Amino acid sequence: MGKNNSKLAPEELEDLVQNTEFSEQELKQWYKGFLKDCPSGILNLEEFQQLYIKFFPYGDASKFAQHAFRTFDKNGDGTIDFREFICALSVTSRGSFEQKLNWAFEMYDLDGDGRITRLEMLEIIEAIYKMVGTVIMMRMNQDGLTPQQRVDKIFKKMDQDKDDQITLEEFKEAAKSDPSIVLLLQCDMQK
């Protein structure tokens, strides 16, 4: 998709205008920046992790970046092209609450089976704790919960049928009925 081209092809640009929340001008700017950072037109996992490390210098962002990468890489080819990047960015930055919930669920559902287990949830929550670093986490995590305690609290609120897994429907219903759950999922990063 437009690899090594300095401009998006008109049909690609039109497609992205239709399928993202970005304007034509914004897409052109994002594409220019993407090519500056990724001259090959694609990001591999290592490059993606380096971007996260720049944004989270006080912790270890590598594990969380690995999960985000998996969620961005829609076709599963081990790289992120501009389309995958901008579509994910559109959802996470400007998408509807529903779109963001779907994206978050996809990230937490590590094996893609449509259910989040306690272990999957714990892996993501631990990755978030490591990413932001100890000092920042202590400031953000005013309730003092460990990753395991946070998972237990989330499951108590979300796992309606008490089968130790969360379906997309349970995930959405709980998040809509109790917005504080979304903060738990983010480890209160929005405070």
UniProtKB/Swiss-Prot annotation:
GO terms for biological process: regulation of signal transduction; response to heat. Pfam families: EF-hand_1, EF-hand_7. Ca(2+) 3 binds at D159, D161, D163, Q165, E170. Keywords: Calcium, Lipoprotein, Metal-binding, Myristate, Repeat. One of its GO terms (molecular function) is protein domain specific binding. Ca(2+) 2 binds at D109, D111, D113, R115, E120. Neuron-specific in the central and peripheral nervous system. Residues 24-59, 60-95, 96-131, 146-181 form the EF-hand domain. Ca(2+) 1 binds at D73, N75, D77, T79, E84. A lipid is attached at G2 (N-myristoyl glycine). Belongs to the recoverin family. May be involved in the calcium-dependent regulation of rhodopsin phosphorylation. Probably binds two or three calcium ions. PANTHER family: CALCIUM BINDING PROTEINS, HIPPOCALCIN-LIKE PROTEIN 4. This is Hippocalcin-like protein 4. The lineage of its organism: Eukaryota, Metazoa, Chordata, Craniata, Vertebrata.
